[in-house]
UniProtKB/Swiss-Prot annotation:
This is Truncated Ankyrin repeat protein OPG003. SMART domains: ANK (SM00248). Belongs to the orthopoxvirus OPG003 family. SUPFAM superfamilies: Ankyrin repeat. It comes from the Viruses. InterPro entries: Ankyrin_rpt, Ankyrin_rpt-contain_sf.
């Protein structure tokens, strides 16, 4: 066998050895990284589980893990029930491993339902990339309508990068369907939410607003002093000025005047 052939075989053997060795190292590091990440997720679950004395059914994994904290619900519970401390070890782990922009009922919506909600924490979360203001539930309603903390100031923070609400045309409808917050109604209307957006029964924002007024004053007729409903009239004028159709008809059929 010639010296050249022997040299070629040696080079091939060395190359094969290096290739296999580097592949092994790469896979080893990958496995170690995955195990490390799983270890940190387990740590998050452990901390949250040890701090929770009760787990509402809404946070169960579709009933599969009832009564248990899991990787699927741990971040939701953290942002809903915990006093979020941005300097804590737990917060840093959550930021590192949780999907802050999970579609549906996301960490953002959970945090806006937190009774210890803090605008400064919200700003930090947004700085970390939280961006799913417009997520909707299975019925097509905005999750933010369930918030305990939303007001004009919080809306400004959440929508700082959004020029208008034209892509969330039903936001005003959602709020007037479930809430009766005068200043926020103006805010959403002025931002561009469609006043003629209708639900499955063809009820528009104006229908719901008139229903709120009717129900509220019927139930409080003997408790309140005489009022000319100046504030309510102002909003009705405003929503009409922004294009609300006062002749919109529902499936019943009924108009705004018959609501």
């Amino acid at each position: 066998m010639s010296r050249i052939n022997i040299t070629k075989k040696i080079y091939c053997s060395v190359f094969l050895f290096l290739f296999l060795f580097l592949s092994y190292i790469s896979n080893y590091e990958k496995v170690n990284d995955e195990m490390y990440e799983m270890g940190e997720m387990d740590e998050i679950v452990s901390i949250v589980r040890d701090s929770m004395w009760y787990i509402p059914n809404v946070f169960m994994d579709d009933g599969k893990n009832e009564g248990h904290v899991s990787v699927n619900n741990v971040c939701h519970m953290y942002f809903t029930f915990f006093d979020v401390d941005t300097s804590s070890h737990l917060f840093k782990l959550v930021i590192k491993h949780c999907d802050l922009n999970k579609r549906g009922n996301s960490p953002l919506h959970c945090y806006t339902m937190n009774t210890r909600f803090n605008p400064s924490v919200l700003k930090i979360l947004l700085h970390h990339g939280m961006r799913n203001f417009d997520s909707k539930d299975e019925k097509g309603h905005h999750y933010l309508i369930h918030s305990l903390s939303i007001d004009n100031k919080i809306f400004d923070i959440l929508t700082d990068t959004i020029d208008d609400f034209s892509k969330s045309s039903d936001l005003l409808l959602c709020y007037l369907r479930y809430k009766f917050n005068g200043s926020l109604n103006y805010y959403v209307l002025y931002k561009g939410s469609d006043p003629n957006c209708a639900d499955e029964d063809e009820l528009t924002s104006l229908h719901y607003y008139c229903k709120h007024i009717s129900t509220f004053y019927k139930s409080n007729y003997y408790k309140l002093s005489h009022t000319k409903m100046r504030a309510e009239k102002r909003f009705i004028y405003a929503i009409i000025d922004y294009g609300a159709n006062i002749n919109a008809v529902t499936h019943l059929p009924s108009t705004v005047y018959q609501t």
